[in-house]
């Protein structure tokens, strides 16, 4: 009775899980063997009109339950305990028990086959040559070929690792947090892009922001909405003629028409109309979600999940077929699976129904109609599907199943009939009449049965590959005789198998023990008997094979690609040799080759240049011959009566150059003395004319010249004879200026005679021997040319040029004399004694100090220059003083290095606020003051203390810890960065400007050296004492002080058509506008004038101004904060804002003050009434008085003007000019 309970226990969860795993395995293997388009997950149901063996029993179950009118109870024959038999209400589940038990037995058989193949493979590996056979068996068992490990792998995009599965790769990518900056706040998942993170967040929030305008559908992504919108598109060219549905392509329409054709065939075959909507290419169930297109590792892992020893479709025997040979039908005998526990040696059963009938008929009391099952008429007619294990009771069900499941296996729908005929001729099914069906007699206890084939009661066994004959087996038809005494049956507690004897039971347990000792891989399910093999196999799952290319040398570097290794070898381990084409010597580097060329193949030849004629020589012998033959003074005339040619050559103390004569030495020394220095920049010049031209071209004006000074500041007088140079030096010492030489004294010896005076007969010449007076020269026409020729040096052309220049300057001085018929008067008129200021008391005691040594007792700047040349070996006349921080340097290289490192003097200088480019740091520093937001407040931004002057600014700068700090530092008023001492002084002067100091916006400074004047109460003079002494301007300063008593200096006033940025006066307003445009593009004129609105480029500022008017007034970006005016350029705005500052301070024109002319007449003489031509040149000044009358410019004492008056003969003077000038002179 215990055996019955174990056999008839109900379906357990363990058995159901096992069946589900086996079913999943079958679906996977079917997907792998058949096409990927075949839906293996389709399971027919009763609603589809498909009949299955399960559905037959389920339909017949209610009938069997309804016919159970007289249930009886019985005892088992031979059972001592007398337990009740199971009730017949469990009979409808018999087929389910058989189904589960059948698949469980198949799983056990597959597991046994797997163990057998593993043993054979192990034995073949040891013997050698058996591995191939085992692998082929395994391939046949699983239906899959073992592929290489590299196939189907996934490589990380951030590193070199590869993974066999996509899930492993996705999990690994999350470890690269440095490459995935965006994190989901819900699940902490990392993403590379923000859009991916936002798209992922919509899965958590269920946001559907993209809604269809035609229906109520909503989507979380825009591309999904676009795909959905195509369903509403009515403009599709391909329309279905049956359902009027549109398609974009002909292929889609053709696929759709195949569906209509298929549905029509199903309806014609009598199928269920409800099944017409089924698509043969639909997605499978969850158990078959493993795609057949996946990699080998995926399918093997899914197979391992289904069962520890999952079967393959290749293990299941094919469906048995009946072979009609010669009219006789042979059928293969099925393998018995069930045995009776009471008579196991007598008979075996292939189904639970036969075993149940056997138990009820032989081993228990008869039960009237206990297991009688109603037989339907069509139950005996079974049709099997060739491509799967399903059976059907009619042809329509088989056809519907074939069309729905195996549509792509057939060439055309018409082949169904051929397929049916082929199955009929092959004997796959055999229709049977209802009379041939087995009938169970009411008396189940009698051993006698009807003489019918025992195989007819058995179901179709698909696990048997052998064909069974249709004729009944005589041995199987023998009635079962109950044994006299049932032997003992041994049941296995692991698999519930019943064993007839103990020996079988022990062998069966050994198989379980051997199976338990197997080490099963948790990744792929492979069983391994030994621990070492198991470990090696598990390590192989985590092993990712890669390749790298190592450098075989001692560097030990590795590379992922062979190209990188080759590049490394070429760059690191290949020695490039340079071969000298002259001597074939090899060098390893370019530097070594250069050194070799310099040492071995370079020959230095000294060039000897003659300083007199500039001829080159390559040997000392040639040079000495040249000097002896061409520049020796032995054969030349003497310079004077008592002088003779020097016996030794003269050598320059600065550059060690050798000169053959004293005159040549003086010419050479003049090249070292560039005493004319520009007051605005460090440039120096030999000749004053070059300085004047430099001032006009670079600084917009002309250097102040003293018209009434007879001193001609040219150093070329040193080129004259030594007595003349000595006389010039003595004259210069009287003026306390070593750089200015008096030509009158220097050329005094050029005109012979000891007595005589200037002629009075309108420029008549006197005799050459008459000496001039003490205070006058002879007329240039009375020059003793013979004496001049007698003193001529070996350079007559140069002496002639010097004499001609002197004569021209003396002629100009004569033409400006009070009377035209007198000789040249004294060019030094007596200065007014009342207005001439006395020399400063410390002028004679002023000392200069050298910045390179500790010497401070130098009495003049010329002595300072000489000291630097002699003591510090400075061979250039260029100043080595920094123009920004006033630092002195020993060499030009040190000064340039200082400018590059501290003041950034190279390249363009760009303002970091407005991106404007300037040519120098000084201009940039002045420009940055325009961006100062605090302006001329004069208050400290840290503590708010007012700063009165520059000294207070510097003193207060130290209070905030900036005194000892090195540049750059921040301004205490505007917080701008100051990069140099010049910029610091500029900010100090800018922020300490006071509007209460007499209306002046600037403190008085020298017009030449820009240094503040020590005392502003002396007068409106714009020159300091040092500049007056240096440039011999003492007389001019006295003349400036005279009109100061009659008219005070007015403040800066507004002048029409004058640029307020550079004080330049333009002829009309259009020129002023063009001039302001040039200010805007200062430093970049070579690139043209471009429009910042449309990028148009013009070559002239006038074209740009005309073009800017096309953009309209609304395009002007710069507006004034004091008035509603707007401008196109920043320079226009700055000019306009400075005009606001100057207009309220304009005063009415003062009374005209008659200022004596620069070239005034001598005392006691009347003004010249003769017509003259007056040329006026305006210089850059800080104050210009506004003109009351536009046609009459007023002369202000602060203005520096140079008037050159030229005398014109009466016969060449144009008519009308004389009268006009006379009227203007009389009005003045």
Swiss-Prot record:
A matching Pfam family: zf-C2H2
Entry keyword set: Activator, Developmental protein, DNA-binding, Metal-binding, Nucleus, Repeat, Repressor, Transcription, Transcription regulation, Zinc, Zinc-finger
Stretches with biased composition (Polar residues): 1158-1169, 1217-1228
Localisation: Nucleus
Recorded phenotype for the gene knockout or disruption: Flies display a structurally abnormal 'filzkoerper' part of the posterior spiracles. They die during larval stage, possibly due to spiracular defects.
ZnF (C2H2-type) intervals: 154-176, 182-204, 210-232, 238-260, 383-406, 490-512, 519-541, 549-573, 578-601, 608-631, 676-699, 880-903, 909-931, 938-960, 969-991, 1057-1079, 1089-1111, 1118-1140
Skewed-composition ranges (Pro residues): 829-842
Tissue: In embryos, it is expressed in posterior spiracles and peripheral nervous system.
Keyword Mitochondrion: no
Gene Ontology MF: a single term: DNA binding
Biological process, per Gene Ontology: negative regulation of DNA-templated transcription; positive regulation of DNA-templated transcription; spiracle morphogenesis, open tracheal system
Basic residues bias (residue ranges): 88-105
Compositional bias segments (type: Basic and acidic residues): 438-455
Signal peptide coordinates: none
Chain segments annotated as coiled-coil in the UniProt record: none
Compositional bias ranges of the Gly residues kind: 758-767
Bias type Low complexity, positions: 34-47
Compositional bias segments (type: Acidic residues): 1179-1204
Disordered: annotated span: 30-105, 306-331, 438-483, 758-778, 817-848, 1138-1228
Family listed: Belongs to the krueppel C2H2-type zinc-finger protein family.
Physiological role: Probable transcription factor that can both act as an activator or a repressor depending on the context. Involved in posterior spiracle development. Acts downstream of ems and cut in posterior spiracle development.
Protein name (Swiss-Prot/TrEMBL): Zinc finger protein 423 homolog
Annotated gene: L
